[in-house]
């Protein structure tokens, strides 16, 4: 009875849907268009629900008939199967499906099973938390906590996964808010992360953030308002809230909860131990942390050639790959016959803003012992010669020079000469300042003359427009025009006088300097 009522209701709903679609195609009143569209959507949903209910009822009847046929004797089995087939075909016709051959149905079922298994595997890996590598733009390798969003293949066919980083420390690592919904319009040109494809072999176990180990003064990574995690230091802890001060001077101090703070990616370099065992443990931890170690000057010189390039295990290793393609064998020297150098070339830091010629000159000066001693050696004999000189005998010409120049009798001729040189330098500097001031005055006066000429041009145009119209306005314009012309004449005279002063100064310079 329930099956018949559902079938009748389904028939009624389909008839109503056809009427609504006919009304929409007929072009009804625009005010009723929205209501009809909503009614069509509701009827479609109602038909889908009724079909699913009818399908479940018929499945239950089919299962009950199968259970009943199992208890029947064996000779009557073909008749039971045929009746079941008839019911199944009637059921498929009722829901509007076409019957398929048995082989096709088996193939479809096996294909659907395989696809379901693949989907289950993808669903199993999706959402998994791991520790994934991240190669920064400056070439360093860091491991960050991440979440798997799907499985993909790398370019070389190797199995990989796409991950999104949970604690982004750069804008390029921050997940795009529209990527997971499939609404991002920028695709590869988006400035945010759409996930990074990582090989399965490069993944590491997820490391849970131990916030309990943080104390006042501990370094940490803190989440800013822009969603990026920046390096910071804890300054205060009070009732579950952490006050942090960011290392960047551009970011202000913030009060955050525990879920907005994590320990740094690698431990602080300041926390070290005096024991040798602790040092070895720290070295092992540094090797396992995924960061390249910086060797000191002493250790770099004693590094064995077989260990050279070992840091490339934590990077893409493009240098070693290029050398291997060119035929280089690890541990041997460079060159065709492996007779070249094995150790790396030491970098030489040159001063900024200096050319190679200047750097070579500086190195040669250092080797020669410097230039200052050479200059001092030159000055010494001159100073001794001046100090050891004897006072020349006075004559009548010295007496006349003293009286005419106003020089005291005890002053030496060399001292008067130096005083005259100082006075000449002061006069020369004063003349340079006065010349600069004259040049500035000439430029300002020329600019004022141009402004006054433009003003006279505007007044002449206004006067030409008002000819024969208003005598009062014309008289005012004529007065302003005559005043502007007088000011222009005065400015031109001032410019001529300044130019004369400039020429006089230039002539004086030519006459006094040889």
From Swiss-Prot:
GO biological process terms on file: negative regulation of DNA-templated transcription; negative regulation of epidermal growth factor-activated receptor activity
InterPro entries in alphabetical order: G_patch_dom, Znf-CCCH_4, Znf_CCCH
Domain of life: Eukaryota
GO molecular function: DNA-binding transcription factor activity; sequence-specific DNA binding; zinc ion binding
Keywords noted in UniProt: DNA-binding, Metal-binding, Nucleus, Repressor, Transcription, Transcription regulation, Zinc, Zinc-finger
Sequence ranges assigned to domain G-patch in this UniProt record: 315-373
Keyword hit for Nucleotide-binding: no
Bias (Acidic residues): 115-124, 272-287
Location (main, coarse): nucleus
Gene Ontology terms: cellular component: nucleus
A family per Pfam: zf-CCCH_4
Basic residues composition bias: residue spans: 365-383
Keyword Zinc-finger annotated: yes
Region described as Disordered: spans on this chain: 96-129, 262-288, 363-422, 494-514
Subcellular location: Nucleus
ZnF (C3H1-type) ranges: 171-197
PANTHER family in alphabetical order: ZINC FINGER CCCH-TYPE WITH G PATCH DOMAIN-CONTAINING PROTEIN
Task of the protein: Transcription repressor that specifically binds the 5'-GGAG[GA]A[GA]A-3' consensus sequence. Represses transcription by recruiting the chromatin multiprotein complex NuRD to target promoters. Negatively regulates expression of EGFR, a gene involved in cell proliferation, survival and migration.
Protein name: Zinc finger CCCH-type with G patch domain-containing protein
Gene source species: Xenopus tropicalis (Western clawed frog)
Organism placement in taxonomy: Eukaryota, Metazoa, Chordata, Craniata, Vertebrata
């Amino acid at each position: 009875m329930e099956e018949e009522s559902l079938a009748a209701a389904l028939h009624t709903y389909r008839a109503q849907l056809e009427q609504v679609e006919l009304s929409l195609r007929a072009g009804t009143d625009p005010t009723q268009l929205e209501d009809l569209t909503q009614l069509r959507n509701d009827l479609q949903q109602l038909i889908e629900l009724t079909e699913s209910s009818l399908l479940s009822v018929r499945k239950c009847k089919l299962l009950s008939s199968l259970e009943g046929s199992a208890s029947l004797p064996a000779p009557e089995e073909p008749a039971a199967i045929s009746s079941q087939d008839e019911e199944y075909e009637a059921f498929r016709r009722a829901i509007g499906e076409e019957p398929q051959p048995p082989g096709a149905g088996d193939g479809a079922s096996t294909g659907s099973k395989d696809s379901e298994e693949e989907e289950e595997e993808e669903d199993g890996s999706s959402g998994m938390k791991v520790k994934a590598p991240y190669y920064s733009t400056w070439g360093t390798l860091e491991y960050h906590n991440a979440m798997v969003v799907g499985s993909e293949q790398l370019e070389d066919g190797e199995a990989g996964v796409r991950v999104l980083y949970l604690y982004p420390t750069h804008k390029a690592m921050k997940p795009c808010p529209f990527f997971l919904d499939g609404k991002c319009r920028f695709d590869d040109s988006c400035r945010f992360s759409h996930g990074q494809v990582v090989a399965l072999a490069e993944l590491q176990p997820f490391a849970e953030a131990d916030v309990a180990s943080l104390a006042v003064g501990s370094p940490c990574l803190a989440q800013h308002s822009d969603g990026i995690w920046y390096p910071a230091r804890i300054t205060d802890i009070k009732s579950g809230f952490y006050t942090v001060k960011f290392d960047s001077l551009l970011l202000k101090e913030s009060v955050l909860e525990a879920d907005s703070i994590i320990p740094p990616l690698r431990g602080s370099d300041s926390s070290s131990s005096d024991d040798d065992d602790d040092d070895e443990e720290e070295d092992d931890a540094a090797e396992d942390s995924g960061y390249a170690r910086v060797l000191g000057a002493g250790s770099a010189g004693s590094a064995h050639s077989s260990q050279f390039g070992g840091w490339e295990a934590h990077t893409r290793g493009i240098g070693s790959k290029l050398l291997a393609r060119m035929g280089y064998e690890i541990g041997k020297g460079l060159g065709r016959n492996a007779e070249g150098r094995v150790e790396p070339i030491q970098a030489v830091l040159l001063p900024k803003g200096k050319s190679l010629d200047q750097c070579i000159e500086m190195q040669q000066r250092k080797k020669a012992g410097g230039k200052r001693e050479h200059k001092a050696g030159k000055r010494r004999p001159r100073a001794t010669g001046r100090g050891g000189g004897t006072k020349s005998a006075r004559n009548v010409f010295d007496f006349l020079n003293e009286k005419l120049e106003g020089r005291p009798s005890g002053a030496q001729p060399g001292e008067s000469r130096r005083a005259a040189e100082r006075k000449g330098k002061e006069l020369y500097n004063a003349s340079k300042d006065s010349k600069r001031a004259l040049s500035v005055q000439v430029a300002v006066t020329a600019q004022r003359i141009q402004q006054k000429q433009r003003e006279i041009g505007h007044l002449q145009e206004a006067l030409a427009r008002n000819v024969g119209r208003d005598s009062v306005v014309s008289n005012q314009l004529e007065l302003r025009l005559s005043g502007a012309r007088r000011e222009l004449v005065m400015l031109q005279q001032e410019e001529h006088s300044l130019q004369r002063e400039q020429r006089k100064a230039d002539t004086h310079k030519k006459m006094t300097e040889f």
